Amino acid sequence: LVLISLLLIFVALSVVWKRRRGTIVLVTGAVFWMLGSVLPGPLVRLANDHYTAINDPRFGSRMAIVVLGGGTSYDHQRRLVPKGDAMTRIDLAASLYKRCVETEKSCFVIVSGGNPQHHEQSEADLYGSLLLDAGVKRADLILENESLDTYENARNTEKILRSRQYDRLLLITSSLHMRRAMLAFDAFGLHPQPTVAYVRPPLTWWLPRRKGWFDSNSALHELVGIARFYVWRWIGLY
């Protein structure tokens, strides 16, 4: 978590600079106060970039719909479920697939997501079962269940698409994740049409809230990931 890493940095600074410990504590408190109150909105707005609305994608005659994993978690009954807003990605993919089939177009769905949280199922396997329940045909569903990050999402999806014919590629993820995902997919020669499933609203408060820290952490995670992409690109890893 980005905020935990930031806190550890402040703790390390207070240990190294003992004479400045009081100042560091005050600065730490002020920074985390703002991260829970006034900064979530601007950070989310920056991470969202221009992906601020759920768009209606253009269809082709041969459609490839890629759904990126957004994590898994256990509900109060200890059932494994999509984490956070990930269910919106599944719902949107099922809806677009249905529209595609109704217009008698050729379409298939790729779900890309491994098991970085070490749960009983990968993201792709769990999401895939829900897409089957929503009406996606098994023959039109491809599960890519090895990716552990956005880089691997793009790399492994590109490998799958090499042997597939398509004239339109849709990429489904959240507004926060879309900018980083598009950078990764473009780097692998894929130029998908961004299709936002959920827009994170840029909310701000005067007093710190748990949701404020959550939003700040999510936005900073994406912004750090974007910065890392450009560093990796510069040194030739992408």
Predicted feature residues:
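Membrane-interface elements of multi-pass transporters and channels
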Residues: 19, 46-54, 234-238
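C-terminal functional extensions of proteins
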Residues: 221-225
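Membrane-embedded alpha-helical segments of integral membrane proteins
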Residues: 1-15
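Short, aromatic-rich membrane-interface segments at the entry and exit
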Residues: 2-4, 19-25
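A structural signal for short, hydrophobic/glycine-enriched beta-strand patches
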Residues: 37-213
